[in-house]
């Protein structure tokens, strides 16, 4: 039996706009329950929605970033379903005419670049949030603060073939939205949510069979998404062997992911389009957007996207794949590096220092690079001292700590404390000769193959120079001198 795993993703991204999609209420996470609502949020009789123009602008930018075709007429529809946290009984969304269609993203896989097509991007509003208390079986609460929050839904084509590819696509999409400042894309607070559609195409005796599509929900991390896909692949393969269920006979159903046990659990049959009874939203007019308007919106956010930045960084600075991926996860970190690298004699060493020492500080303090208290030029100068052999890497770390404490450049600290390494070969030879003359027994031990004698003599050299001698040069000159003794 041969089979192919087929995966499509539906991603909901809550936009970081100041106000909600169709009213003037603040669009913020958390807060006192039901403190940011109005008659429009609750669908009260007589309330009329109005479109937040920034929702349309955000959709245009998302379409541009994903190489999508952008529609010139915006139409909203009512999507009907009944949940306690949907007070109107319908959601304002887009059905047959999404604002963006036929886009794509390139992702990096183990076998190279792969194009993942995007079927559509459409605008809609979020629902409220139901809260079920563990200590109460008979009570639930509803917070409508999220009701009406602006969303974009991105629907990928079923071009994804593994859990790793799904995570790569989601990572790329998240980076783009963060680069554009459209959303925090934080799965913990619900601003980045993903449903995964999975099934298998099984080939037996030259005949293809499609297994029923499972739409998996309750996925709260990229790790969960990958685990759910891998579990579902095994489950559907076993189900085919036992029951030979097909897509034609069983259709599509919804499953939830049990993160604790690593399994998916049946929830319900999946609704069809007709179940939602779509029709055009009568309270919102058609909105026309011309090419000039779209071009102006694109110009506002004329930025380099992560994938393009990675290619450029490798070509321009010779950085590794790991380095460029890490640097481009945060556009502010990338900008910090480029400002530090612009006048550096060795940009790769600057990158190494930022990705090790600077990132370590940021992670320990739980801050972003925007809150870091050293200018990029300070890092450049510190690395130049290392490259020139004026201070050791070990000493540089001590200098770095004092730089952060005092918020002064490395040159000030090195000058005040006379920390500059001795790299003059003539001076180093003099110190080496002194140590050799004072330690004839160590020379004899070295000749007998005792390696610890070298370590002892290097220790004496460092002691005589108060730790300021260049250890690499000192070791070279010591070995040369011993070969001539």
UniProtKB/Swiss-Prot annotation:
Record-linked InterPro entries: Asn/Gln-tRNA_amidoTrfase_suB/E, Asn/Gln-tRNA_Trfase_suB/E_cat, Asn/Gln_amidotransferase, Asn/Gln_tRNA_amidoTrase-B-like, GatB, GatB_Yqey_C_2, Gln-tRNA_amidoTrfase_suB_CS, Gln_synth/guanido_kin_cat_dom
Keywords associated with the record: ATP-binding, Ligase, Nucleotide-binding, Protein biosynthesis
Catalytic activity: L-glutamyl-tRNA(Gln) + L-glutamine + ATP + H2O = L-glutaminyl-tRNA(Gln) + L-glutamate + ADP + phosphate + H(+); L-aspartyl-tRNA(Asn) + L-glutamine + ATP + H2O = L-asparaginyl-tRNA(Asn) + L-glutamate + ADP + phosphate + 2 H(+)
One Pfam family here: GatB_Yqey
Broad EC category: ligase
GO molecular function: asparaginyl-tRNA synthase (glutamine-hydrolyzing) activity; ATP binding; glutaminyl-tRNA synthase (glutamine-hydrolyzing) activity
EC number from the UniProt entry: 6.3.5.-
Similarity comment: family membership: Belongs to the GatB/GatE family. GatB subfamily.
Cited function: Allows the formation of correctly charged Asn-tRNA(Asn) or Gln-tRNA(Gln) through the transamidation of misacylated Asp-tRNA(Asn) or Glu-tRNA(Gln) in organisms which lack either or both of asparaginyl-tRNA or glutaminyl-tRNA synthetases. The reaction takes place in the presence of glutamine and ATP through an activated phospho-Asp-tRNA(Asn) or phospho-Glu-tRNA(Gln).
Subunit details: Heterotrimer of A, B and C subunits.
Stated name of the protein: Aspartyl/glutamyl-tRNA(Asn/Gln) amidotransferase subunit B
Protein's organism: Borrelia garinii subsp. bavariensis (strain ATCC BAA-2496 / DSM 23469 / PBi) (Borreliella bavariensis)
